[in-house]
Amino acid sequence: MEHIIEINGLNKSFGDVKAVRDLSFHVQKGELFAFLGVNGAGKSTTISVMCGQLRKDSGSVVICGENIEHGLDKITRKLGVVFQNSVLDKSLSVRDNLRSRAALYGITGKEFKSRLSELAAMLDFETILD
C-alpha cells in the first residue's frame, strides 16, 4: 500500500534541547493516524518540520512521494494543519489573517486574491472578510 507520509530518522534540536530524536514512522493512504504524546514530546516540532516551517537537522521527510528537501512547494499546497490553539490575530480582519497564513505557503498577490475570491464565494463568507 502507498505511504502518504514517510518519516525516517528525523532529528531536530534547539540548541542543546533535542526536540525530536531519531523519529521514524509512516502513514499509509487511507489509514487513520493519531500523533499523540506528552507535552514536549516533539509533536508540534515534527509537524512544523513536515510543513516546512522548521528545518530539520537530519533524517528524511517524504509526503505524497515528495521529499521536503526538493518538493516543499508541492507539499505545502496539499497539506493542511489545524492546531489546538488558534493562530489567528484578533486585531486583523479575516482577509488579513488569511493573507498572512497564505503567505507562509507562498500564496501571495494575484494568486491569493483569486483563490480567496473563489473560496469566499464557494463557502459563502464574503460578507465577513473585512
Predicted segments, located by residue:
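Short coil-to-beta microelement around the adenine-binding A-loop and adjacent beta1/P-loop entry
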Residues: V17-K18, D73
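Walker A (P-loop) phosphate-binding loop of ABC-type ATPase nucleotide-binding domains
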Residues: V38-G42
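Conserved ABC ATPase "signature" region
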Residues: R99, A103, K110-I128
